[in-house]
């Protein structure tokens, strides 16, 4: 019933939101029926999931947000998709990504207001979860591609520590920075997903009842608007009143150049990882992407 409800929601809203680049309803329903007949064997049994279209899927096209790869069919699943299948998840389809998970946006609109951006690069995954098309969607982050669209669309975005989730079978942009993440609608849903991927229970976390949270204003704090600063200060006060230990984090002066360093690493490694596309399909790349390598 959950999978059918998600598909019905997609039929109603996809023309307005544009979260999906590939959707196979028959295949999704076949997976769901197989889950209904089978004994639950995984922590995500029967849960519908959207997959960002830079993760390889053996039974669905993977286009990486580029016309260069239109109709491209990988032979194998990415490591993440393979895990999801083994955990019992139903793969509904592929969600819209920006071109190679970088700057050029796709068709996705913000589900709360079509005149607003959903954020990128994991646009479709964030918008699909926000619009109740799917309860869980996978994204990636090289700069802010999970936490930004999660914020813009009003959902929970989870970007784990770099290297905790395998990026095998994910089209690389910057191999020193690329990180898998996910979108859900609540902290409780995130807890379930976290337990599924790491097979860890809350009881195994000794500091769970009294977490410590670092509050870091960063060198860019003054660039934030008053409403943003007030929201963060309010969150700090709320956490503190609930027994959370708040630790003020002061970054060394050297961290003020971190953003520029990140940009240099990202552009350099993207040039390496997109060398084939730049050499053989230059005209099919967006002007915006080409401009990064013509400076």
Task: Cite the ranges covered by each PLM segment.
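Conserved core segment of the aminotransferase class I/II
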Residues: 187-198, 271-276
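Short glycine/serine-rich loop segments
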Residues: 76-194
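Gly/Ser-rich, acidic/histidine-flanked active-site/gating loops
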Residues: 46, 179, 195-264
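Short helix-loop capping/hinge segments that flank enzyme active sites or metal/cofactor-binding pockets
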Residues: 44-64, 210-212, 264-295
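Residue-level signal for inorganic ion chemistry
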Residues: 6, 28, 190, 213, ...
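Short, well-ordered alpha-helical
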Residues: 1-73, 101-102, 232
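Charged, often glycine-rich, active-site loop that binds/positions anionic groups
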Residues: 106-113, 258-273
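Short, well-ordered beta-strand elements within core beta-sheets of diverse protein domains
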Residues: 50, 68-72, 178-185, 293-295
């Amino acid at each position: 019933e959950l999978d059918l409800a998600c598909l019905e929601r997609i039929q109603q809203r996809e023309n307005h939101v544009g979260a999906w680049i590939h959707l196979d309803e028959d295949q999704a329903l076949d997976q769901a029926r197989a889950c209904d007949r089978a004994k639950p064997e995984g922590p995500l049994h029967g849960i519908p999931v959207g997959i960002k279209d830079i993760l390889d899927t053996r039974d669905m096209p993977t286009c990486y947000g580029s016309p260069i790869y239109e109709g491209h069919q990988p032979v194998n699943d990415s490591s993440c998709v393979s895990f999801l299948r083994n955990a019992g998840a139903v793969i509904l389809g592929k969600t819209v990504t920006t071109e190679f998970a970088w700057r050029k946006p796709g068709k996705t609109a913000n589900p709360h207001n079509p005149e607003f951006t959903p954020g990128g690069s994991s646009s479709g995954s964030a918008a699909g979860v926000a619009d109740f098309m799917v309860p869980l969607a996978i994204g990636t982050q090289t700069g802010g591609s999970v936490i930004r669209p999660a914020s813009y669309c009003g959902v929970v975005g989870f970007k784990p520590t770099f290297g905790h989730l395998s990026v095998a079978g994910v089209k690389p942009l910057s191999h020193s920075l690329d990180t898998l993440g996910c979108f859900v609608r609540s902290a409780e849903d995130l807890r379930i997903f976290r337990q599924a991927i790491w097979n860890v229970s809350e009881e195994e976390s000794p500091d769970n009842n009294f977490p410590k949270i670092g509050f870091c204003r960063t060198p860019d704090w003054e660039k934030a608007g008053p409403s943003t600063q007030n929201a963060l200060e309010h969150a700090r006060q709320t956490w503190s009143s609930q027994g959370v230990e708040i630790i003020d984090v002061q970054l060394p002066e050297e961290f003020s150049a971190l953003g520029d360093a990140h940009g240099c690493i990202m552009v350099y490694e993207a040039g390496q990882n997109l060398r084939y596309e730049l050499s053989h399909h230059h005209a099919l790349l967006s002007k915006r992407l080409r401009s990064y390598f013509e400076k």
